[in-house]
Structures are given as C-alpha cells and as structure tokens.
C-alpha cells in the first residue's frame, strides 16, 4: 500500500492512524512549493507570511496600499478545501485553521480546479478594473500551465516574492524560499523492505525515478541530480 502526497497528513489523520496502530513513513521524492500570484499589471512585488495570514485568516486588508502596493482593491481567491493547494495553504499559512469567514473570500471567489486558480485571477482585472486579485497554487503547475492549455502565466500574472525571496527552481531546491515543500511517498512504517511499495519508493529516488519526477513537472531532489 502506497500513497503519493503533496503534504504530510493532518494532525487529525495522524491521530486516526495512531489509534489504529499504524505509523506512517514519509519519503520525500520531489520538490515543489506554494506560490502566490497576482495580475501582471499590479506593481506589488511581494508579501510577507504575516500579511498572507492577515489576508486569508483575519480578512484584515481590502486595499493593496495596506501591504505596500498600489491604491487598488485587494481581491483574494482561494482553492476548494479538498485540493492539494489548499492542503499546503492549511499547513503553511492557516496553521491548520480556517479561511476568513467574511469578505471577498466568502463571496464566491473559490477556484475548484488548478486551471481556474490561474484563469480566475487573470480574469479578475477585466471584471473589477479598480483592483487586483491574488491567488495561490503549486509552483511546478504554475510553470507548466501553458502546456496544459492555460495560457495565462506569460503575460497576465506574476509570482509574488514571500518574505523577500522570489520562488525559483534554485530558491525552492535550497529551501531559501519560505514556502518550499516536498512531495512524498507515504508508506506504513512497517512496510517490508522487499515489498512492491518499498521498491517503488526506492525507484523514485533513483536517477531514473528522478527523471520521471522531472518529466512530470516537479523538481528533482538535489541528491539525485548528481
């Protein structure tokens, strides 16, 4: 039995596993990161994690000027709660809490697919020209969006630096980008060494497996690149 996961299990799931006498083992197989993006025309270049928490948890801002940007409406978009992007959001920004229950987030600004997470933010400028949207996704999806027929990343959106560090292959791999993350293979800790699940994990860490990771659009682990 094996599971591919973009984040570690929630505290609740870990407790359920423990109650069932199961210990989970997480084996990192690829790099990824959570990224935030806004309309290309927005002169704002970055936010802090604290500001993101104020936006999505406390609904503290409604204008980009409050976070060092232009005098323009701030329109936050979110993902559906059963998405991998939202799982990272819960872990890294919400601290396993909930989104704000007021403001624009509650008024329907929810993207239910990876593709619409990008197109919704890109189109927000057309429907609300007095403001700029902000949304989030995972880095390697954002980079490969054009090949998945979501032609918005090159000229309609730009990524925001977080705590002064812009997301890139290099800053995600070396961990300096603060929202860097790993993708995991998840096994039972007592999975036998000669089991198919354990052999799959070993393959994913081999040079051949890391090539599969790269072809799938994720970042290969440093130790597997050499």
Feature locations, PLM:
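Exported/periplasmic ABC-transporter solute-binding proteins
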Residues: 1-32, 37-226
């Amino acid at each position: 039995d094996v599971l591919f996961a973009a984040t570690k299990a929630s505290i609740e799931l870990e407790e359920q596993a423990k109650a069932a006498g199961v210990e989970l083992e997480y084996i990192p197989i690829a790099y990824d990161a959570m990224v935030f993006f806004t309309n290309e025309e927005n002169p704002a270049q970055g936010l802090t994690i604290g500001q993101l928490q104020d936006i999505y948890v406390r609904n503290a801002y409604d204008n980009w000027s409050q976070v060092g940007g232009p005098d323009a409406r701030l329109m936050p978009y979110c993902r559906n709660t059963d998405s991998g992007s939202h799982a990272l959001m819960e872990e890294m920004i919400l601290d396993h809490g909930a989104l704000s229950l007021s403001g624009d987030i509650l008024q329907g600004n929810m993207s239910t697919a990876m593709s619409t997470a990008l197109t919704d933010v890109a189109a927000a400028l057309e429907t609300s020209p007095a403001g700029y949207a902000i949304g989030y996704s995972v880095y390697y999806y954002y980079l490969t969006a054009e090949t998945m027929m979501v032609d918005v990343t090159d000229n309609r959106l730009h990524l925001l630096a977080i705590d002064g560090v812009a997301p890139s292959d290099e800053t995600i791999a070396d961990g300096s980008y603060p929202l860097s993350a790993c993708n995991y293979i998840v096994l039972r800790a007592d999975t036998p060494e000669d089991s198919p699940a354990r052999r799959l994990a070993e393959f994913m860490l081999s040079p051949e497996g890391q090539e599969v990771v790269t072809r799938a659009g994720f970042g290969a682990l440093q130790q597997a690149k050499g």
